[in-house]
Structure formats: C-alpha cells, structure tokens
Amino acid sequence: MLNFFAAAPKGFEYSLAQELTEFGATEIKESVAGVYFTAPLALAYRITLWTRLASRIVLVIYKGPCESAEQLYNAAYCIDWSAHFSNRNTFSIDFHGTGGFINNTQFGALKIKDAIVDRFRDDGDARPNVARIDADIKIDAHFRNGVITIAMNFSGPSLHQRGYRSTTGEAPLKENLAANMLVRSGWKAAPTTLLDPFCGSGTVLIEAALMAADIAPGLQRSRFGFEHWRRHDKATWHEILEEAKARASLGVKRCDVKFYGSDIDSRLVALAKRNAQNAGVLELIDFKVANALNVEPPAGEGYLITNPPYGERLGSVSELLQLYYQLGDKFKKEFGGWKVAMLCSDIELISALKLKADKQMKMFNGALECAFNLYTLHAQSTRRDTPVLPEGVDIADIAPAFANRIKKNAKQLEKWAKKEGIDSYRLYDADIPEYNVAVDRYLDHIVVQEYMAPASIPEAVTKRRLSDVLLALPAAIGVDPHKITMKTRERQKGTNQYQKLDERKLELITTEYGAKFKLNLTGYLDTGLFLDHRLTRRLVGQKSKGRRVLNLFSYTGSASVHAALGGAKSVTTVDMSNTYLAWAKENFALNDLSGKQYEFVQADCLQWIRDSALDKSAQYDLIFIDPPTFSNSKRMEDSFDVQRDHVNLLGMLIKLLSPNGEIVFSNNKRKFKMDTETLAKMKIKVENIDDLTLPMDYKRNPHIHNTWLITHA
C-alpha cells in the first residue's frame, strides 16, 4: 500500500473523501484543502485518471518531526531517491510553509535539494540536474507545526486541466469546481435533465456530460507526474487507460440524459461548443444563444445548475440585482418541480432571488469565496421575506416606504433644480433610518452611497435592505439600472474621502450656476464635487470680484472656478494631491479660464499655511478653507483634528488676510464647536452662516456641514 494526499480547493474535503471512498481507497483522513488516503498502485492510477474533484495527487514519501535545518536535511537524505528516479531525470522542489528555523521557502527548498544530490553522490551516482520548468520529477514539501512532509507529485499538472478547454471565457469556472457543484447539488447521484442558462464556456454542462457518459476526466490529459517515476507500471497504466477509453465509447452511446445550455454571448456559446467537441460530448448537449430571462424550461422536471454573472466591478450591482430578482421571479413562475443550484460570490445578489434556500454552502472559485445555494421550486414557491407580487405590481413595492419617499423627493426637487440651474443634487439622505443610504442624481445617473450601519444591526439585514433599495430605485424614479452606481461610505477616517475605488471611469460634465465641472462617478469614493457645498461655492463666487482669492484643501478646485467666474483678481488653489490639482486644471479649462492670475500649488496645506504666515507679503482678500475632519496622511508632517486644531489654524490664516478680507471656513464635523471665546481674544470675529449655505436638497440633514464667516475684529 502507498500513502497519498489528494489536494483540492478549500470546501471540497467532504466531497473528495466521499469520492475516494467510492473508489475503494482506505485510511481516508480529511485535512485542510485535501484528503490523506492509502491505495495500491493500480488504484492510485485509477484515482488519478478518474477523480473529478482533486487538484493534485501526491505520493507521500516521508512525514515526521522537524525542528532544525539539520533535521530537515536528514529527513530528505534518508530517502532512497534512486528508487524513485534516475540521475538522468531532472527534478524540482516546491516548498510550502515557514516558521521556526525556516524563514523563507527558498531556504527549505535548498536544504532538500542539497540532501537529494548528496544522497545520489554518496550512493555512487552522478548528481541529477535541477530544472525550474518542466522537470521530470516534482517534489512537494510542506512544513507545518514542526512537521515536514516530503512527497512526489504523482498526478502532474493540476487535475482540473482536463484537456478539453481551448480558451477560457472572461470568468472561467474551474472544472473541478463545476464537478463539485454537480456533486453537492445532488445531481450526480441521480442524473436527470440539466439546464445552465448562463453556460459561458460550457464547463458545468461538459463536466455533467462526462459524468453521465462515464468518461474519465483525465482521459485527454497528455502528461502525468508518475511517467518518469521508477516504480511506474506501464502495463497496468495502459490497461486502466484502455478500459477508460472503452467505457467512454460505450457511455456516450448509452447516455440518455438531456443537457441544455445557453448564454447571451454568441462568442461564448461557440467556445462552449468547441470545448464540448474536444471533450467528446457535443452530441449530448443542446447549446443556443439566448437571454437567460427568455429561456423556457425543458419538458418535465430537472436541475438548473449555474454560475451566473456576479460583476466584481463597481457600478454594475444595481443592474445585476434586477437580473437576479427577475430570475427568481421566473424560477417561481415557470420552473415548478425543478431544483436550482446557484454559485455566487455576492450575498446581496443571491438574496435578490427572494427564494428560500434548502441548503447554503461555501465554495471557493479560486481565492473568491462564494455561496452555493440549493433551492427546490415547488409548484407554488413563495418568495422569502416578501409576499408574492401579483401581476402588475411594481417592483418598488418590495420597499414601499423607501420607494414612496424617494419618488416624492424626486418630484419636488426636479422643478427646484431646473429653476436653480443645477443638474446634480441629493434625492434622499437616510430619510428612513432602515434604508441607511444617500442617493444623488448626477444628470441622468444615480449614485447610491451606503452608510456604515450600527454594529447592533446584523450584516444580513443591512445587505437585504440595500438590495431592496437598489431593486426599487429604477421603477421609483425612472432610471435605467445600468446608470446606477453603488458605493459604500463609512465614517470619515483620515483620508478615507480620497480613497481610490476603481480604475474604470464613468465621467460626466455637470452644470452648477453656470459653472461646469467634471465628475467621475466610479473612480473615487467622492465624485469630484461635494454637493452640500453648492451654496458655499456660489457665495465664494459672489464675494470674489476684484479680490485675491485663496482656496485651501481645494480638492478638485470647484470653489476656485466659481471665484474665477465671479471676477477674482487672482485665484490660488492649494492641495496636496497632484491628481486633484490636475482635475482642478481640467475644471478651469472646461470654463475657458486661463492665465497667470490662476495659480495651482501642490503642497501640504498646513505646512504651506505655516510658511506663508511668515511671509508678510502673502495677503489675500478672500480665503476659502474646507479642511478634513481628521487627517494623518503619510505625506503630512502632523495629524490634523479640526476640533482640536481650528484655533491654531485660524490664527495662522488671519495673518494671510488683508484688513478688509474674509475667510469662509467650513467643515463636516457634526458636533463641531467653534472656540469663539479664544478667537475673540485673538481679535478674530466669527459669524455662523449655516443658514446661507445649506441647500434645499440637504434641509433634511442640517448637520451635513457647518460654515463660518471670519474677519479681523
């Protein structure tokens, strides 16, 4: 008997142990990401050829305690390597695990390599050569918790590579993951009609057809790890291969299971057909190009097993939620008696099906953790948490309170916005506590920002509510789902407001009181324009004529644009970010503003203020400053807290202000308290102007910011 380890993705252990038991392996023991077992050589060959779940089979040669480099060397040296491969063979070592005396895997691999070549030399043979690529023999070593396991890769390249895939689709599903979906769904135990309406490159259907037609998944592989092993029994292997070929030929002829696959992408359907042809099962599968929402169930009952799109890219979530909701509705109405098994990485999406799962499992698609849910669709399946919607009822009724509120807000604000001369404004700001989101309109696009929920509310509840919001929005305010972008906003910490989210850009040009600004709805947490400061920017513009204007913590320079359009004598725009200064320059160009009177300065604003306060000639007539609530950026010398530091900050700013000048000071700290007493002693006059700077669309949230007009006393 030989000792083996079958490696597999996390979550496969139970299924793999069951498969090995069915093969006849013994001493089966589940471990992390794999299963140990023993088997005679012939059975090991059969398992390697027929396993549908394992990623790799390794022959365990040594396993024992290891507490020093010397012990590691001795463990490898004591193995009679010449019994496993010739010195004419090349070899490589994959070492996994660190800890204790092993600081890095390269050190461990080097020790084992030295032991192997020394053993060959001491036995009177020439040393074998190491090959980093395509070695004849691959040694796998694992060090964990003071135990070293040394093994030989018995199966060769990853067993999920069956050999039938020509190229992959955009998001390929690994073959052994598809096989595990078929096993855990219950389909493999009783093969029946199978439908995949998001078939992509056909992996689920092809794996199912291979099972139903009794075709060994490794039959088309061109290489196995044991081929250069000295104990390889070519005759036994040939016999097992020929038996598998005969079973495959007979199995295809006898298979009476019906398979149906469709995808909206004709290129993927063509690819699926090529893959099925390569696998020898094309005649068993009916492929067609179709929208999943238009696919009709085949006659009778069966299984629908699929891996639908779950869009990892920001901004596609609303459209996908609509798709999942419509799928759930279709399943309920048209697939009575069927079983559905669905793999998805996003709990919000899969919950949008509004179906009660019989079973929920975890699987990993590569490093991506996914939910694998099983559903039984009874003739009168009901939606979870929601009454069945009668014909003609709007989808918004799944969140009626939210839908009614935002519909009312939108109706009121649309006329106001047109009159104001703006096309970007806030529609909803957590008006109903259960729906803790902000919804902003930017022309014909919508941005939904989720606020961080209190810790007392279960995550599943917040996700369901967010899902309902995104489902209700299109019907409630008449917006296309693909024009809804979703973002998650937490309480501001340091420079969170500048966190980059996505390389993809969705850029628009918005108009505000005659000024034009570039927006990026997807690249950053904020879009490039703080809508709550709309009136503050207009106020800056109104106060700027003939004045020298300074804009600090300028972000994308929108206040600077208003100042320039308002007739400022000069405008100095200061921000630490080159990205935002470049954006500010674009905003100036959009408004046909150019000239030496417009200066852009990249600097740590606090340090720039300190330095400028020492320069008596640095005088400004109007200063606008909107500092972060808190910042500890690595590029800033010190941390900044607006409550703690505002007196010191204003004390420096007043030195930059001309005798009749004004400072417009704003911040977003909700419980900010201006230290008027200390400032008065410094001969600084302070006036709160919140009433002048709170726009109508923010009246529901009067603490969104606080604004002050500051002058010399």
From Swiss-Prot:
Gene3D superfamilies reported in the protein's UniProt record: 3.30.2130.30, RNA methyltransferase domain (HRMD) like (3.30.750.80), Vaccinia Virus protein VP39 (3.40.50.150)
Molecular function terms from GO: 23S rRNA (guanine(2445)-N(2))-methyltransferase activity; RNA binding; rRNA (guanine-N7-)-methyltransferase activity
Keyword rRNA processing set for record: yes
GO CC field: cytoplasm
EC primary class: transferase
Alphabetic keyword roster: Cytoplasm, Methyltransferase, RNA-binding, rRNA processing, S-adenosyl-L-methionine, Transferase
SUPFAM superfamilies the UniProt entry points to: S-adenosyl-L-methionine-dependent methyltransferases (SSF53335)
Keyword Methyltransferase (UniProt): yes
Predominant place of localization: cytoplasm
Enzyme Commission number(s) from the entry: 2.1.1.173, 2.1.1.264
Signal peptide: none
Location of the protein in the cell: Cytoplasm
Pfam families the UniProt entry points to: Methyltrans_SAM, RlmL_1st, THUMP, UPF0020
Domain THUMP: 43-154
Enzymatic reactions: guanosine(2445) in 23S rRNA + S-adenosyl-L-methionine = N(2)-methylguanosine(2445) in 23S rRNA + S-adenosyl-L-homocysteine + H(+); guanosine(2069) in 23S rRNA + S-adenosyl-L-methionine = N(2)-methylguanosine(2069) in 23S rRNA + S-adenosyl-L-homocysteine + H(+)
Lineage: superkingdom: Bacteria
SMART domains, sorted: THUMP (SM00981)
Residue ranges of the TM segments: none
HAMAP family assigned to the protein according to its UniProt record, in alphabetical order: 23SrRNA_methyltr_KL
Its biological purpose: Specifically methylates the guanine in position 2445 (m2G2445) and the guanine in position 2069 (m7G2069) of 23S rRNA.
Family listed: Belongs to the methyltransferase superfamily. RlmKL family.
Protein name, UniProt field: Ribosomal RNA large subunit methyltransferase K/L
Organism: Shewanella sp. (strain MR-7)
Native organism taxonomy: Bacteria, Pseudomonadati, Pseudomonadota, Gammaproteobacteria, Alteromonadales
